[in-house]
C-alpha cells in the first residue's frame, strides 16, 4: 500500500489525480483564510481522504472522479451553495456517498474484514448489498455529524427531517450503483489484492 501511495505517477491520468490532491492542499489555506478555520479543517479532511484511491491502487479514472466529487462537495459547503440551491444537496450526496461507500468496501476487503465478492457465488449481488449497507450507514453518520455541527458549531448548517430522508435515499442509491459497478472500480492489479512492489500502474 505504501509503495502504491509513494510511487511516481505514470501517465496523464495519474498526474491529473495527483494535481487534484495538490489543489486540495492549496484549498486548505484558501478556505481557512477566506472562510474561517472550520472551512480549512473541512478541506484538510477532504485532502486526507483523497489519498485513499491512490493508496488502494484504484484505476486513475476512479481516482479523478473521487477527487472531483469530494472537492465539489466540500466547496459547495464552504461557499454556501447547499443553502442557496437546496436541490444541489441531493446529487452531491448520490455521488459522494456512493464513492465513499465503495472505498470503504474496498478497504474492508483489503484488510480481510469482509470477503472479496469475487470469491462468492453471486459477486455482483454480494457487492451491491454490502456497499449499499455501508452507504446507508455512512449516510446516518453524516446526518448525525450535521446535527452535531448545527447544534454545537454553526447554527447555519441546515438540518431537517425531509432533508435527512432525502440525503439517505439518494446516498443509498449512489451506494447501490457503486456496488453494482464494483467490478469496474476494482479492475486493477492492486485494488483488492495486497499491493506489491512491482505492480503495474492501474489501467484507465
Model regions: which residues?
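Mid-bilayer segments of alpha-helical transmembrane spans in multi-pass integral membrane proteins
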Residues: 98-106, 131-144
Amino acid at each position: 500500500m505504501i509503495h502504491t501511495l509513494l510511487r511516481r505517477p505514470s501517465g496523464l491520468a495519474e498526474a491529473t489525480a495527483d494535481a487534484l490532491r495538490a489543489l486540495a492542499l492549496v484549498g486548505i489555506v484558501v478556505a481557512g483564510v477566506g472562510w474561517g478555520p472550520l472551512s480549512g479543517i473541512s478541506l484538510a479532511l477532504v485532502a486526507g481522504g483523497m489519498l485513499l484511491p491512490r493508496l488502494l491502487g484504484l484505476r486513475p479514472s476512479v481516482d479523478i472522479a473521487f477527487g472531483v466529487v469530494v472537492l465539489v462537495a466540500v466547496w459547495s459547503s464552504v461557499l454556501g451553495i447547499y443553502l442557496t440551491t437546496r436541490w444541489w444537496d441531493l446529487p452531491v450526496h448520490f455521488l459522494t456517498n456512493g464513492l465513499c461507500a465503495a472505498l470503504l468496501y474496498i478497504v474492508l476487503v483489503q484488510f480481510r474484514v469482509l470477503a472479496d465478492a469475487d470469491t462468492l457465488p453471486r459477486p455482483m449481488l454480494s457487492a451491491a448489498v454490502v456497499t449499499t449497507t455501508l452507504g446507508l450507514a455512512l449516510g446516518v453518520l453524516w446526518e448525525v455529524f450535521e446535527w452535531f455541527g448545527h447544534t454545537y458549531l454553526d447554527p447555519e448548517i441546515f438540518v431537517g427531517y425531509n432533508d435527512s430522508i432525502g440525503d439517505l435515499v439518494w446516498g443509498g442509491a449512489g451506494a447501490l450503483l457503486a456496488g453494482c459497478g464494483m467490478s469496474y472500480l476494482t479492475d486493477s492489479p492492486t485494488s483488492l489484492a495486497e499491493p506489491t512492489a512491482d505492480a503495474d500502474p492501474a489501467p484507465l
